[in-house]
Amino acid sequence: MNKELWLQAAKDAGIEEFEIYDQNTKSTSIRLYEGSVDGFTISECRGISLRGIYNGKMGICFLEESDDSLLEFALNQIKQNANSITSEDEAEIYAGAQEYPDVKEKENHMLDLPSEEKINLLKEIEQELKNHDERITQVMSTNYGQVEMCRAIDNTKGVHLGDEHHASYITCAVMAKDGDDTKIASDWKYIYDKQDLNPKEFAQALCAKVIAKLHGEPVESGNYPVLLQNEAMSDLLTALSGMFHGESIYKGVSILKDKLGETVFDKRISIVDDPLLESGYESAAFDDEGVACYRKYLVEQGVFKTCLHNLKSAKLMNTVSTGNGFKGGYASSVDISPTNLYIEQGDVSYEDMIGSMDKGIIITEITGLHAGLNPISTEFSLQSSGFLVEGGKIVRPVNLITVAGNFMEAMKNIRMIGEDLKMGSSGIGSPSILFESLAISGK
């Protein structure tokens, strides 16, 4: 595609402003089962999103080919689409920032590693899982995945941006059985080099995780101090992250409406959106509208400081975009998305948090976030599993319990914040947090 040709042709056709969003994604997936490659797929998708303002309305056209022969067709589609728009929303194509930040991305040596070596790494992990404990009855899956994504934004207002993003990861799932009890657990890890992953240590941690779940039982219902482990806390924060979206606040479907500048959480809680995080999965110098990204506090020492905006929500609230306008794919509309959003970690070890509890519950897994959570009120009632703590020690696993409360209230009643920040696969992370009291329903 001769982009300069397209930009000039759009102007000549009477399109007031014109943008080319070009995305190319290549994905590789290797699945191992019982020592053999059970699946090996390589897929590549090239997509181009064209936007143009014609008679004050935004028209769009999507292409899967970058052939210049499609130019006349695409421009006509944009005009027709714009003429069908009845919305009175003001259309905008961004004019660009004065400068854009540098994002440091760790070099990914896995991309050039021969497939045979990636498969051998999976085989080594699978064998370590099988050899660890006789209670490991099945290695359900051992997978390697990698994603290579390139994107470029060019428009008639002088914006010419481009970047690349790479990610490689391992995922595994195992089954453990002891007597009549069977449990399943999984784990994953981003890797940039073979040296980033020790197969034996990875397998030991996953096996310990699943074996610890065996023979869990409910606890007596009541209010307990509850330690939400970092992964469970990240899942909960992910499900509620929409409360920080500017459009949700503007529409009144966020509990944070009219709370800017107010203390909403414990003063030890600070929540950051950091698109410049080195080697962060969601790191980016600019969003999908061409707006420069920057590090910002959503909550600082308990005070609600700012929300996340794309160009549309910023205009609705008479402010500027925070560089959080992203697409789910090249053919998706621009939405609001966080970029490496996390709760800053504290200074208490996981072991010390456990040791501080006379009697309490550790929650390691929560499920039912789609049904047991009200994203507006932040009330939650979630199926959970974890461990019972007595006298500062883990005494047994627990399952078939429900943890319930209100997120906003819980975040005002915190006993300790861990030093174990972990980013989730969604790009949202949290340390483990010990809450003063949450309702547990068991037996």
Model-derived features: positions:
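Dual-mode signal for accessory low-complexity, basic/Gly-rich regions
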Residues: K259-K443
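Active-site bordering "gate/hinge" segments
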Residues: M1-V291, E300-V303, G391-K393, G429-K443
